[in-house]
Amino acid sequence: MYQFVSLLRLNKPIGIFLLFWPCAWSLTMTQWFVVNNYLFIKYLILFFIGSIIMRSAGCVYNDIVDKKIDFRVQRTKKRLIASGKISVTTAWLSISFLIIPALIILFQFNNFSKILGLSSGLLIITYPFMKRITFWPQLFLGFTFNWGVLLGWSVFFENITLETIILYMTGVFWTLGYDTIYALQDKVDDLKIKVKSTAIKFRHDLKNFLFFCYISSITLLVALGFLTGRSFIYFILIAIAALHLTFQVIIIQKIKSNNKDKIQKVFNSNNSFGLLIFLIFFLEIYYG
């Protein structure tokens, strides 16, 4: 049983929350324009369950595609598929079982959202191959991992607006930053086996690159606030969120590249940032 918990990464739930928070931001933003407590809570629950399912399926699929790469990387060589403890066939069966409840959730939404949700499949399928062909797999993950922003808005309004795009790109730059931090754990091994990442591309200018990513996210959140007429407190709280990201960059600069535990802790702290933005958005429903 524990093997399947490990295969689905349920023992490492940080990825579930990083996938869920952008969905929650978007769902909460809809309530700035039309308050429907029942649907809001219902969709939050469905999106959270969906995040668990899709993150698990994505991890299994990535492990299948990256089997040979994972075996050559110190941090991942003991993963169940890479080590041969679970067969590729069993892994595919696991994905099949996960897709069924995911589709059940998706098909509760309107037709626009169904098409939008299904279209994310192309990004999910393509993502694991990006590290082989470009130094920007983290950017591609950003576009993939934040698709829930578009979906969260569309389940209420059946469209995509400028506000949605701004929030989507907020998540993309945030993911680009935090996944670059995550990739630092494997930088030495990735250089040896020629796996590409932004952690490698910007290894000599990491601080400036991370600041670029995080400043872009905060700037977009500020722009969103002005566009939607947010309250003064919104901008104060966004400034506090900006400090959170700033401290990440400062701390990561002081960590040695072989200290994977500390790198992981900085990466994990993004769960707090995601929660903070959700709470800021939630407060705006009633005080904005």
Stretches with model-predicted labels:
Residues I14-L18, Y38, K42-L46, G50, ...:
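Alpha-helical transmembrane segments of integral membrane proteins
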Residues Y2-S6, W25, I49, S56-A57, ...:
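Intramembrane alpha-helical segments
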Residues T219, A223-G288:
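Extended hydrophobic alpha-helices typical of membrane-associated regions
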Residues L10-M29, N146, L276-F278:
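The first (N-terminal) embedded transmembrane alpha-helix
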Residues C23-A24, S51, I99, G121-I124, ...:
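Residue-level recognition of pore/gate-forming positions within transmembrane alpha-helices
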Residues M1-F4, C59-I86, T180-R203, I251-K262:
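Cytosolic, membrane-interface loops and tails of multi-pass inner-membrane proteins
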Residues W25-F48, P101-I115, V149-M169, T219-F235, ...:
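Helix-coil boundary and interhelical linker segments in multi-pass alpha-helical membrane proteins
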Residues L46-S51, K67-G117, F173, L191-F232, ...:
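Multi-pass membrane catalytic core of lipid/isoprenoid biosynthesis enzymes
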